[in-house]
Structure formats: structure tokens, C-alpha cells
Amino acid sequence: MPQETFSRTACTAALLCCLCAWLCPPAAYGQDALLSAVPTANVISPAERDASCRIIYLGFVGALEPSQNKHSGVVQIGETLRGVDYPDVCAKSYSPYVWTDGLDWLLKHFPAHSGVLTSQELQHCPKVILVGHSMGGWAMLSVARRLRSRDIPVELTIQVDSVGITDYTVPRNVKTGAIFHARDVLMPLTTKHLRLEDASHTKMLADITVEGAGHESITRDPRIRELVMQTIASLRAGFAAPPIGE
């Protein structure tokens, strides 16, 4: 995307996010109770995680948020996954403005060469889950497309009230995808439905309008967390199963 177009899109999204936050504070949607329901997670050191990381959770917040915004459901999921119950998960969240930093962090867990990964290499690589809110939805799919160029699969992508010019098509390396959107002042700009680059490779799990949610509070919809946790549980079950033929 040209820098001028990116800047124009980012500024528009940022200004409208401000307006949305002012007109529709999260408390107005009755979802703030979800914040207190998220337990504080015990933290395992990054070095310990990197040594045993089998699943990567990479989240992107909205354009106006700090990457560690405690009110964002994207961040809250990551905090849970950094707890002692998930020693095999590496989880981080980033601003969409520095989405390449998130990509670089993710790729540190993969072979260093720049070419396509072989099936043998992928057997020893972590599984990837991507979640993005607002302009973070665009950032998330930008990461997925970069991974596609190396044949790195993505187990799950979730777009949450996504805002962006190139966030309509889910790339073929994504196995399952979902989109959640709200009815609020940003509605004219947010992505409502997705296209699949290759329907034989990608399955849409959810296309949901979250009633009563605003552009910020939608990130705390429990179904988003549930999709992430279900995917992790399924991946863990696959790790435990013996290879076919044994």
C-alpha cells in the first residue's frame, strides 16, 4: 500500500475511533463486567516460553491504543495465554503501526532462511493464531500474507470490527477464519464480510454482528476468546495424538 494511502486510512480510522470512544463508551454496552472476569495471569519468563513454544498468539490492537491496552480483549487473551496454564504458548500484542515488528517476532520461532519452508521443517514449527481489532485487522492479514509467501500456515484468524483497504480477502494459507463486527459510528468503514482466496483451503467459522457492542467493547465479546481457546485445545490434542501409522 502506498505510504500516502496508508497514512490517509490510518488518520481517518484514528479520528473516527476517537469519535466512537467519546460517543459510545464501553460502559454503555454493559460489557465492562467482562474485564473483572479475566483473572490475573502468572507470568512465565520469555526465555522459558521460547524454549517450549508450540503455539503462537499474535494480536494487533486498534490504531489509537497502546499495544498493552488492558481494556482490549485482544490484549486480555494474550495475558491469559502468558499464564502458567499455557507454558507452550507464546503470546504478544502490537500496534498496527509496527505490524512488521510483530511479524519479525513471530518469524524468530521459524527457520531463519528466507525461502519456502518444507513440510519437514513445518513439523517442528509452532502453530500460528492471529487476531486483529480495527486497523489491527488489516495488520493481521498483512502478516498472514507475508507468511503465505513462505508457505507457513495460519490455524486461525479473527478480525474484530476490522478497518482497512486490504482486509477483505483471507489468504489461502489460513485454515480457519472469523469476523466480528459492531453496529456503531464506524460501521460505514468496517469490514462486514470476507472473501476467501481459496475456499478449498480456508473455512469460515463465524461471521457475526455483535448486538449492543461498540467499536472498543466488541473486543471483549466472549465468543472471540472462546474461538482462540478452542483452537488451542484442538492443537494441543493433536500434539498428544500419535502420528498416523504408529
Question: Can you say where each PLM-predicted feature lies in the sequence?
Answer:
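Bacterial N-terminal signal peptides
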Residues: 12-24
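Serine-dependent carboxylesterase/thioesterase catalytic core
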Residues: 81, 88-89, 106-194
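Extracytoplasmic/secreted proteins, especially bacterial periplasmic and envelope-associated proteins
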Residues: 72, 76, 101, 105, ...
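C-terminal catalytic-base region of ester-bond hydrolases, centering on the histidine
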Residues: 172-246
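Bacterial N-terminal signal peptides that target proteins for export
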Residues: 2-14
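Boundary at the C-terminal end of the N-terminal hydrophobic targeting segment
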Residues: 28-30
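Conserved beta-strand scaffold positions in the cores of enzyme catalytic domains, especially
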Residues: 57-59, 88-93, 157, 177-179, ...
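Active-site catalytic motif of lipid deacylating hydrolases and related acyltransferases
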Residues: 33-34, 42-126, 215
